[in-house]
Amino acid sequence: MEITQTTTPESPRDWPTLLGDNARTGGQGQIKLHFPEKAAWQYRAGSAVRSAPVLREGILYVASVSGALHAIDVGTGTCKWKFQSAGQIHATPSLSGNIVLFGCDDGKVYALDRHSGKKLWEAASQAEVWSSAVIRDGVVFFGSADGKVYAVDAGNGHEKWVQNLGGRIYSTPYAAEHQLYVGCGDGKVSCLAADSGKILWGTPTGNGIDSSPAVADGLVLIGSEDFCVYALNASTGEVRWKYETGLGIASSPAVSGDLATIGSKDGFLYAFDVQTGQLRWKTEVGEVVTAPPVIADGGVCIQAGGLRALDPANGKIVWRAHLGTAIQSVPVLTSDGIYIASLGSEVYALR
């Protein structure tokens, strides 16, 4: 493993869901990014990790493809508890209060006590759940490969509503106060009423969507397998701007201030002005980019043939870590270091 640069450890910070918070922007500009110089510890999850870890109060929750959810003490790298589900896990867990939730290939979303790992409830769909759960106002929203979006009670898992969108859903919804935004395998970006699931609008793109939307300044930002990044009016679905990259986009956008970044399968990371779509910069990172970037004060982090950090002002690579194993997971950025999991089953704390 090779890591370059230096760090000054500070206090840890929670990271409770995919891309840090329910806004799904991946924008953590309030965190001052310190570039780690070594791995403080390494934990073996027993099988590949394709989803992102989440963090709360010093416990890192990591889901492995073998179906296990691991609760790891970030101070020591030791396992506090482990829960074994009935199917593989590709979805990133989410934390809300004392609950940790995750979707599973057995078609269920599980809710566990985050302190003990005890199962509290489960909610069933009709196909695998790769979409991460979103929790807002006591309701859990998630999409399934059966083409449906589900809303269930966060307290007991009882169904509130189901909406069929017609194509498999791997995209993680964005939950606003009254609306839900999600991409679909049929190529549409849909806006649903959060209280009923009623479809308010749907905007087609030219191919399927696995990207998860971010919402900023009244715009829904999302990528499509038609090679394009889209910015849609959040109220109407009208296309404000779009930009064509060199290949399909499975990555999701990260937004910080007026800067939006997203990766493409063409091997480039792109940065745009949120409102105008003007290209600020693009940087070749040398690998197919499917994971979302994350943004902190001082760097845009992306996994592509190893973990890299780019200067948000110009896209120049300022730091990289070669961990000796392939990574598909999204990193967790905190003020005391970076946590990331690998396809080789390793979970690393970089400090």
PLM regions and their residue ranges:
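Short, solvent-exposed mixed-charge patches
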Residues: 1, 350-351
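Short loop/turn segments that connect beta-strands within beta-propeller blades
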Residues: 73-77, 113-116, 153-156, 193-197, ...
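A short beta-strand motif characteristic of beta-propeller blades
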Residues: 39-43, 78-83, 118-123, 158-163, ...
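Blade/loop signatures of beta-propeller domains
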Residues: 4-39
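Repeat-blade elements of multi-bladed beta-propeller folds
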Residues: 9-22, 46-70, 83-110, 122-150, ...
